[in-house]
Amino acid sequence: DTLFDKRVYFGEWVEYHDMVDNNLPKTAEDYRHGTAVDSIIVDGPRLNPWLDDGCGRFRVRHFGVAIGSKFSSFTITKQIKEIIANNKDIKVWNISLGSNQEINDNFISAEAAVLDKIQYENDIIFVIAGTNKPSTDIVKIGSPADSINSMVVNAVTKNGLSTKYARRGLALSFFAKPDVSYYGGSEEQYIRVCEPLGEANVAGTSFAAPWIARKLSYLIDILGLNKEVAKAMLIDAARDWNEKPTPEEVALYGHGIVPIKMDDIVHTKEDEIKFLVYDISEK
């Protein structure tokens, strides 16, 4: 993400590593986004009681790889590769950065392809923000939100409708990207975060993704599920077995809106039975 300000009230919960070249000038603005995203992962439910998921608080290892709104995706993907190799103990990684340009209908972006390879080789999962609209003429999601192995999250309003800033999939015209949707803040109800100078009300897919990272981390690190099963559990909870969304709805919402409460994800309804079956198919 962008940089992190260690002076905030939850600073002790975050292990911070600044990966940006010291020769580059850093402004106060560069610390806002990264600090806000961390506040959701660490203490989101206290800041937003209506989004209390029952997952508790999380420790964060934060790597500052970008400053301002302009950054080189090549440099960042190279750094991500290095970071993952040196932090094998972390299974869930949140990426709330993305390109303004639209993805291509005919191939996966270079950044997404690299992230897919990293996930496969290291047995980890990325949670990626579905990218925001920089202007009205940009409609499709931007890289790396076309990463197939990642959990891509789009944003909805408190009422469960698509936000003004959300962009749409699909990836390669048939992969459901985004995978799911979650609450990212809007005029009806913004997301409360903690920035370096205090509390702020924000909106964006960047602020929907960390909530899903919390849930994935709970399923993987607390309940001990593997990443494929954890991802499948969230997708399954987002969409009822008898729902049949149109391709347009899938392009905007993915498989649906993930329930707020963790209990609604791990517990089944009275008239349902859920089996978790997983294995690796050998040749």
Question: For each predicted feature, which ranges?
Answer:
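Predominant activation on well-ordered alpha-helical scaffold segments within soluble catalytic domains
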Residues: 38-42, 112, 116, 181, ...
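Secondary-structure boundary elements
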Residues: 6, 47, 85-90, 117-125, ...
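Subtilisin-like serine protease catalytic core
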Residues: 2-18, 23-73, 121-123, 147-149, ...
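Substrate-binding/access-modulating region of protease and related hydrolase catalytic domains
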Residues: 65-145, 201-203, 207-208
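Extracellular S/T/G-rich loop segment that most often corresponds to the catalytic His/Ser-adjacent loop
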Residues: 1-5, 9, 140-217
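C-terminal subdomain of the subtilisin-like protease fold in secreted/lumenal serine endopeptidases
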Residues: 221-283
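Short secondary-structure boundary/capping segments
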Residues: 11-17, 75-79, 109-113, 140-144, ...
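Flexible loop/turn segments at secondary-structure boundaries
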Residues: 5-7, 69-70, 100-104, 134-137, ...
